[in-house]
């Protein structure tokens, strides 16, 4: 009996140290977000890439990646017209012969890096090809990078690009 109690005490004492799921060296803060749908991916945006990941700060940049898919009795949740005044948009895109759906598990901030964690579910297709986007919006902040974590694995880290207006202003005029 004493041996069993001693073993139980050891397991209870050591388990928090020995079985940590993922060591976190940075403090992370949960970030509120909203998901959006009803958009198609432009066939001019990275058309041959199997996956794409973007962080967008303005409507012009968004419009280069996505278009609105209109249908009758449309109930899609789209971005509001003035979204980019207060929000930024993050998107992950999967292309290929599978319909991919997403479930966001969390969005957190670690210093100036946003971390978007989500899971995917794929339904293969014999003939049709798809470009399936995950689109979320969140409040603007002092962020410089976004890390995309898909199904528990770090997939990609991207920098926030300058807005389309800033790019146009920076380009030399002939």
Kindly label every feature range from the protein language model.
Residues 7-15:
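Bacterial N-terminal signal peptides
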Residues 19-174:
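Exposed, flexible binding/inhibitory loops of compact, secreted disulfide-stabilized domains
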């Amino acid at each position: 009996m004493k041996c069993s109690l001693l073993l139980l005490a050891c397991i209870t004492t050591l388990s928090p140290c020995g079985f940590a799921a993922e060591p976190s060296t940075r403090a992370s803060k949960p970030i509120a977000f909203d998901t959006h749908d009803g958009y198609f991916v432009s066939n001019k945006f990275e058309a041959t890439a199997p996956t794409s990941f973007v962080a967008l700060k303005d409507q012009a940049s968004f419009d280069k990646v996505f278009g609105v898919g209109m249908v009758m009795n449309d109930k899609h949740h789209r971005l509001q017209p003035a979204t980019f005044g207060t929000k930024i948009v993050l998107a992950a895109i999967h292309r290929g012969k599978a319909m991919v759906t997403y479930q966001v598990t969390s969005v957190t901030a670690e210093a100036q890096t946003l971390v978007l964690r989500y899971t995917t579910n794929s339904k293969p297709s014999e003939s049709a090809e798809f470009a399936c986007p995950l689109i979320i919006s969140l409040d603007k902040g002092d962020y410089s990078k976004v890390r995309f974590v898909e199904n528990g694995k770090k997939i990609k880290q991207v920098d926030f690009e300058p807005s389309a207006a800033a790019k146009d202003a920076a380009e030399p005029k002939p």
